[in-house]
Amino acid sequence: MWPQDPSRKEVLRFAVSCRILTLMLQALFNAIIPDHHAEAFSPPRLAPSGFVDQLVEGLLGGLSHWDAEHFLFIAEHGYLYEHNFAFFPGFPLALLVGTELLRPLRGLLSLRSCLLISVASLNFLFFMLAAVALHDLGCLVLHCPHQSFYAALLFCLSPANVFLAAGYSEALFALLTFSAMGQLERGRVWTSVLLFAFATGVRSNGLVSVGFLMHSQCQGFFSSLTMLNPLRQLFKLMASLFLSVFTLGLPFALFQYYAYTQFCLPGSARPIPEPLVQLAVDKGYRIAEGNEPPWCFWDVPLIYSYIQDVYWNVGFLKYYELKQVPNFLLAAPVAILVAWATWTYVTTHPWLCLTLGLQRSKNNKTLEKPDLGFLSPQVFVYVVHAAVLLLFGGLCMHVQVLTRFLGSSTPIMYWFPAHLLQDQEPLLRSLKTVPWKPLAEDSPPGQKVPRNPIMGLLYHWKTCSPVTRYILGYFLTYWLLGLLLHCNFLPWT
């Protein structure tokens, strides 16, 4: 059973501790700091609220700000406004499942309170499982238990922390993505395809994950070229690639089609409560009962592309304005981290990168012992994935979302810092000399759990190397600052 694994047990314990501290701090910050009056989506509350609802709002209201309001609104009312379709249905559906489990309390709690409780509890669960999934993935890819352990612990202190706790889809997406990657590394291709498809139903950038499947299948094809029937192998490759692309793209396509039926087909509109209609009038939100929007007449009517362009001004270099310099500075640490990771890997394995990870050496007859850890040949496809996300995010998106965008999508953001810590922190080697401590008295005889080396470094902060201070300083600063600002409607999105 996986909980009996010592390192995974410590990862799970640390994840639980970090989640509890996160929830406590967001409640504290939300209580003592007045909310900033931001120009954000803020729909009216239709149901009356009692004392218990006010208590839930006071304890968990910090999790409902910025984009979280969209997810909560969609879970409660469905996709009423055109711009709601920027948010994929996977997470709202998960919240609805959570509220069904709270149905016995509906006489005491409003639907919104049930949704807030679902946000806190489900993201708590998703985060813990994602940390364990990242640890397991690291063991499979890095072949270095220490780096896998460090990376999973760093994930618990992620700079994207507040978005992994609040009513955002990042925690669920990270769980599905890391789990899908792990299944693919185990050779369970179609389980991986299914998990990647679910991830695409949670966030649109799940579509990029098709690259993992294509690379894995191409590796299998080239390794079988010496077989007697290469044409048959080529046909199998093409069929497998088609099925992978089709399966991963299906959730996205179905979601776009659903939007088309709501806004572009006559008679598909459903009744909307009058206060929400008035909100649409006041704010200029488009609802299905009005004139057909322009995207309905496109050759390929994609509401998602239209919304990103018209509502959020997302596009190539559109965000490159002088007034956005603070947001570029906010995104700079994660951009530097991923760019540094990419450069380190490419300069270490130039031939591997030139051959797209399909050939490790110019001379196939002399196979050197492969590197372990972050520099392992298996990491190539993950580095490419991270670099593509960074390039797209940096050129086409609101750059301030890069931290949560990368922090929930790529293990490179945690593997590379773990590599730097192991490579450049002498204190870790001294900590390894006493790496175990006994479990509680009720544990099996001889069972031990590893010390938490990240906490050990924090305890010995003054003697840590500069690289360690930079890494942990960045992680902890964003971990805490994100809670402080985001939970009070201050600009941390």
Swiss-Prot record:
Pathway(s) per entry: Glycolipid biosynthesis; glycosylphosphatidylinositol-anchor biosynthesis
Primary subcellular site in the record, as a coarse category: endoplasmic reticulum
Topology versus the membrane: Multi-pass membrane protein
UniProt keyword terms in alphabetical order: Disease variant, Endoplasmic reticulum, Glycosyltransferase, GPI-anchor biosynthesis, Intellectual disability, Membrane, Transferase, Transmembrane, Transmembrane helix
PTM statement from Swiss-Prot or TrEMBL: Not N-glycosylated.
Biological process, per Gene Ontology: GPI anchor biosynthetic process
EC number(s) per entry: 2.4.1.-
Disease: Hyperphosphatasia with impaired intellectual development syndrome 1: A severe syndrome characterized by elevated serum alkaline phosphatase, severe intellectual disability, seizures, hypotonia, facial dysmorphism, and hypoplastic terminal phalanges.
Identification of the protein by name: GPI alpha-1,6-mannosyltransferase 2
Lineage of the species this protein comes from: Eukaryota, Metazoa, Chordata, Craniata, Vertebrata
